[in-house]
Regions:
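Catalytic cores of DNA base-excision repair glycosylases
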Residues: 1-208
Length: 209
């Protein structure tokens, strides 16, 4: 596991989230928009959205239908717009306009699950965070870091046992980048993969050739 961590560090030194934001709540909303959508698409949509609604209070007072018009291309825009407005209202009314810093509080916000909460805890608050998105689940299973479970909570529990807390947040960001570049869902680029020597899936594929 340590060799995998160090190899990924060499490929992606920064290990940063690819969603663009300036304010804490903007990251929270961007993650909601990224569900069933690419980060690249979200980054194209959010500048106009945040220009129209420049404060958390303006989101809290917004008509979800108008928010939906700005995020239409992200897909599932009606539900996402409702969640964003409801989340903004709760942040303003119950948290003084601040994004809370605990798993319990974050998952109590509309549209926020453990994946989003972990990302916020890691990127905003600098806490150990295990963001189990589809890339992370797929790749850690292929590498044998986890048992191949597709259940996000099971994967998170296994990663907490095997990935050092101080490495966790950046490791998960690197999993996303590596999943886009090399270890894709279909037709992964096993030939020349820098993690091939530590990957049971790659070794099994090589034997079949």
């Amino acid at each position: 596991v340590n060799r995998i961590i160090e190899t990924l560090k060499g490929i992606y030194p920064d290990g940063l989230c690819s969603l663009q934001y300036e304010k804490d709540y903007e990251l929270l909303f961007a993650v909601r928009l990224s569900a069933q959508c690419t980060d690249e698409r979200v980054n194209k949509v959010t500048p106009a959205l945040y220009a129209r609604f420049p404060t958390l209070e303006s989101f809290a007072e917004a008509d979800p239908k108008e928010v939906g018009e700005y995020i239409h291309s992200c897909g599932f825009y009606n539900g996402k717009a409702r969640d964003i407005v409801a989340c903004a209202r709760k942040l303003v009314n119950e948290y003084g306009g601040k994004v809370p810093g605990t798993m319990e509080e974050l998952t109590g916000l509309p549209g926020v699950g453990r994946k989003t909460a972990n990302l916020i805890l890691g990127d905003v608050f600098g806490q150990p965070a295990y963001v189990c998105d589809t890339h992370c689940i797929r790749i850690t299973g292929r590498l044998g870091i986890t048992d191949g479970s597709k259940d996000p909570l099971q994967v998170e529990r296994q990663l907490r046992e095997r990935i050092p807390p101080k490495e966790s947040n950046n490791f998960c960001h690197r999993m996303v980048l590596f999943g886009r570049d090399t270890c894709t869902a279909r037709s992964p680029k096993c030939d020349g993969c820098p993690l091939a020597k530590d990957c049971g899936t790659s070794k099994a594929a090589a034997k079949k050739k």
